[in-house]
Curated annotation (Swiss-Prot):
Amino-acid permease that is able to transport phenylalanine. Residues 1-80 are annotated as: Disordered. This is Amino-acid permease GAP3. Residues 12-25 have a biased composition (Polar residues). It is found in: Cell membrane.
Length: 599
């Protein structure tokens, strides 16, 4: 019998066997499809699969809980929030991706360029005070977010938590304002990236570079979350190298080891003073510091696509300390020592030429490094643009799934891409071509004013959700022992953060209405450019209340569902692993215990 005849006989016998008629489908033998066809098919709806039994996903919760019987009837919130057969996000982010997103994913123009304006307005001491105190608030907020995300690693994170723990109208207002912010940030960052190129060559039309960067960012996000994670990981590595390199260079320059051999020390603190423009200058710096840390909450959005959130997220949350200390506090300490607050370069320059990091290197007499650091700024800007598409698309998909937006936005294809949000981001990204318009700055300022306070309200929302989560646990007689990760700063860290953010909003109101140099005269245009976001959030909130006719301010503590949304895991097993890990750590030297906790 020939080989061909044997193959035909084997196939025929398989098809005619009793087992094949019951266990094999006609689709077992398929015709290979091209890569292009596979790519096109990936945008189709996912194959229909029956939802898993709800009891299996929750039976591992502690039977000692007074709500154990209720738990058995609940199911994962990711499925309850997802319209039938709309697909779900893929958990393809690895531990290395999450660590890098947490460590430097939000570092961009706010720190690398915007800190120059803050130095001029407030002085070097104001930089340390504002970023130091703001850093404590962000530290508390991210730990609060971490506690919620480890317990409920669902898409939308804080917008979903607002719906669960506060009120649907509040979730609608905060969620859409946050999404709109990222919609506007994308074209802004693309234009900023093109401006970075003009540092080397200003003869080429910036619109050409804008088009290249636009296609690059859209393609990265179209290929899926794994490619987004890889891109962010490598871009963050470049940021870390750049900032650490600048700090080392700063030590050398301050001590007189630069080409000029001039000992700088605290020269500019004595010469120009530690503060500029008095109390209002310091107050204005607080506002800038808050905006420079926008995006710190991105690790929460990523929790829905992390392969192992119970292990990866706690470690990523602890990395926030190093980002605040290394990226912000240490680097700005040397900025205050190396750049005078009244430097003409801070006033007359634009784009990356106004970056205090570039100015510090130039003042040190090093003429090759500014170009290298400008390249790092370019990569940081592209990183923020990449994160803008990611953050916007996931938030919009979550809002659609919760019924807080058009249902079409809830669609997730076979590859786990939220296509509605991606398409919307790509459409708004086309605003980047306004760079060819002579007055694009004015247009972008007014566009950004619509969601200018989104970050502050989102942070406030995280603190509020965490407080109400803890209150609901207490009200329903639940224990913190149910949680595998708790915020280091506890519930009082959230309370402190909420109070701090309210103070920042008051300061923002004052400095927006009476900006520096106004001589006590109100400036209406400046006020609306900086405070219009508060009005927009109020309109969204009241509008949703009127539309739904739901007049309750918030969900009652006893009615908050503390079980739906828990991941399918063996809680007792995880507790045992945690205790075993703690016991192993106790046997290690102190320095190793500290390293394992903070790194």
């Amino acid at each position: 019998m020939t080989t061909k005849e044997k193959d035909e006989f084997n196939i025929g016998s398989l098809q005619n066997s009793p087992e094949s008629s019951t266990n094999m489908s006609p689709d077992v033998i398929t015709t290979p499809i091209s890569k292009w066809q596979a790519f096109k098919d990936s945008f189709k709806p996912p194959e229909q699969k029956p939802l898993a039994s709800s009891s299996s996903s929750t039976s591992s919760l502690s039977a000692s809980s007074p709500h154990h019987n209720d738990v058995a009837n609940n199911y994962d919130i990711e499925k309850s929030l997802r319209p039938d057969q709309q697909g779900e996000l893929k958990r393809e982010l690895k531990n290395r991706h999450v660590q890098m997103i947490a460590l430097g994913g939000s570092v961009g123009t706010g720190l690398l360029i915007g800190s120059g304006g803050a130095l001029h307005q407030g002085g070097p001491a104001a930089l340390l005070i504002a970023w130091g105190i703001t850093g404590t608030m962000v530290f508390c907020i991210i730990h609060s977010l971490g506690e919620l995300c480890v317990a409920f690693p669902v898409n939308g994170a804080f917008s979903t938590y607002a719906n669960m723990f506060v009120d649907s109208s509040w979730a609608f207002a905060v969620g859409w304002n946050y999404a709109i912010m990222w919609l506007i940030v994308l074209p802004l960052e693309l234009v900023a990236a093109a401006m970075c190129i003009t540092y080397w060559n200003d003869e080429i039309n910036p619109a050409s570079w804008v088009a290249i960067f636009y296609v690059l960012i859209v393609v990265i996000n179209i290929f899926g979350v794994k490619y987004y994670g890889d891109a962010e990981m490598y871009l963050t590595i470049f940021k870390i190298i750049a900032i650490v390199g600048f700090i080392i260079l700063g030590v050398v320059l301050v001590c007189g080891g630069g080409p000029t051999h001039e000992f700088i020390g605290n020269k500019y603190w004595k010469q120009d003073g530690a503060f500029a423009n008095g109390f209002k200058g310091v107050a204005t710096t607080f506002v800038t510091a808050s905006y420079s840390m926008a995006g710190s909450e991105m690790v929460g959005l990523a929790s829905a696509e992390v392969a192992n959130p119970q292990k990866s997220l706690p470690k990523a949350i602890r990395q926030v300390f190093w980002r605040i200390f290394l990226f912000y506090f240490l680097s700005l300490t040397f900025i205050g020592l190396l750049v005078p607050s009244n430097s003409p370069q801070l006033l007359g320059a634009s784009g990356t030429s106004a970056s205090p990091f570039v100015i510090a290197i130039k003042n040190g007499g090093i003429y090759a490094l500014p170009s290298i650091f400008n390249a790092c700024i370019l990569l940081s800007v592209l990183s923020v643009g990449n994160s803008a598409v990611y953050g916007c698309s996931r938030t919009i998909q979550s809002l659609g799934a919760q019924g807080l937006g058009p249902k079409i936005f809830a669609y997730v294809d076979r590859k786990g891409r939220p296509l509605g949000g991606l398409v919307m981001s790509a459409i708004f990204g086309l605003l980047c071509f306004l760079s060819a318009y002579h007055d694009e700055a004015t247009i972008f300022n007014w566009l950004l004013s619509v969601a200018g306070l989104a970050t502050i309200f989102s942070w406030f929302n995280i603190g509020l959700c965490h407080v109400r989560f803890r209150l609901a646990l207490r009200k329903q007689g639940r224990s913190l022992q149910e949680l595998t990760f708790t915020a280091l700063t506890g519930v009082w860290g959230s309370v402190y953060s909420m109070i701090f953010l309210c103070v920042v909003l008051v300061i923002q109101f004052w400095t927006a209405l009476f900006p520096l140099g106004s001589k006590g005269k109100a400036n209406a245009e400046n006020f609306f450019q900086n405070y219009l976001g508060a009005v927009v959030i109020l309109i969204f909130y009241v509008g949703h209340k009127l539309y739904t006719r739901n007049w309750k301010l918030c969900v009652k503590l006893e009615d908050i569902d503390l079980d739906s949304g828990r991941r399918s895991f063996d809680l007792d097993l995880i507790r045992a692993e945690i205790e075993e890990e703690k016991a192993a750590n106790k046997a290690k030297p102190l320095y190793k215990r500290l390293w394992n906790y903070w790194c």
